[in-house]
Amino acid sequence: MKLKKIGISLRVEKIEKFNEKRDTISHDWINFLQKLDYFPVLIPNNLTDVEDYISELKLNGIILSGGDNIGEFPERDQTENKILEYAIKNSIPVLGVCRGMQLINTFFNGTISENSNSGHVGKPHNIDIMNPSLVNLFGHDKLEVNSFHNNLIKKDDIGDELDVFALSEKDFTIEGCFHKKYPIIGVMWHPERDQQKKHQSQIIDIFYNKKIW
């Protein structure tokens, strides 16, 4: 059986006790992907050649995971930008989650509304699905999603060639976007944290199988 390999970027944690940086990933991601019959492959942040590494892995999809703010750890920003460059050149689908969606937005010349007292941290809320194709794929035009982000993407922040497909019902900030041409999609919620909800596995299927491109 052919492995369905998904690469996952890693967050950086600075461990003061040992004076070192470590790449980390929530066990939720590994459990979630394996439950859906995907093979998770980790992409570290201190590679000498990101493109060679990804090329050797023969990945079928890539997830830019959450955690860390953009600019907090430059090595992660650089790694994920190189991942996006490689994915675009090789038509590899990409899903950006929370920080990952923000990284996608800045990659395409968008901006982030930082340090907002948004009330999004730890507070589930509804989102409106704006795109008819995605309404059809989800089977609903509204979803309840988790929320763990302070930084926001507002309508004026959205990057070039990105289409908005989901808005927060409470403040109309952007909760989902995708590229008009490339198989790249981002969500501000965390699919790995509410695995029992159907739309969490649906977003993985939509990105991996390029269902809107």
PLM features: residue spans?
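N-terminal beta1-alpha1 cap of cysteine-dependent amidohydrolase-like domains
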Residues: 1-99, 106-113, 118-133, 137-138, ...
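DNA-recognition element of transcription regulators
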Residues: 147-148
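His/Met- and acidic-residue-enriched segments that coordinate or traffic transition-metal cofactors
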Residues: 174
